[in-house]
Amino acid sequence: HSFPTRRSSDLLFTTSVDLDCHKVAFGHHADDAAVTTLMNLMFNGKLETMVPRVVFFDGAVTVIRPLITLPEKELIRYARAAGYPDQPASCPQGETSRRAEVEAFLRQFGCRQEQIRTNLWRAAREAMGF
C-alpha cells in the first residue's frame, strides 16, 4: 500500500476511528497507480499496484480511491474548469523520492508516456485480478 509514511498513515487511521469515520478516501489517480506499479517492479520485483478499495484493522478502516481510474490530466482539466486553484504536490520527500525518480524516467518517453502509464496500470490490474 502506498502512503507517505507509516507514521502518518497510522495517525490518519487512528484519528478516523476516533472520529467514528470508517472510510478514508484518498485522491490517488490512474497515473499514481501506474507509477506505483513501475516502482514495485523496479524496487520490489513484484507486479502490484494500488487497489481501489482496501480494508485495514479487521474492518475498522476502509480506504477507497474513487479517482483511481482517471488520468491526472483529466482531473487537472476538471479542477481548472471548476475554478479550483492549482495545488502543489505535498510529498515530504518532494523531488528526491523514488516516486520522483520514476516520474522523471517516464517523462523521458515524451508523448509515449501516456500510453506507457496506461499499459502499466492495466497490466497490474489484470495480474491482481481487478
PLM region spans:
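Anion (oxyanion) recognition and catalysis
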Residues: 2, 17, 80
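Catalytic subdomain that performs nucleotidyl-dependent activation
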Residues: 23-24, 31-105
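Short, small-residue-biased leader/transition segments that mark boundaries at the very start
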Residues: 1-8
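Short glycine-rich anion-binding loops that position phosphate/pyrophosphate groups of nucleotides
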Residues: 9, 29-32
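Glycine-rich phosphate-binding loop signature in dinucleotide/nucleotide-binding domains
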Residues: 15-21
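A short, charged, Gly/Pro-tolerant segment at domain boundaries
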Residues: 97, 115-130
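Divalent metal-coordination and catalytic microenvironments
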Residues: 12, 79, 120
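C-terminal helical/coil "lid" or tail adjacent to the Rossmann-like core of SAM-dependent
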Residues: 99-114, 120
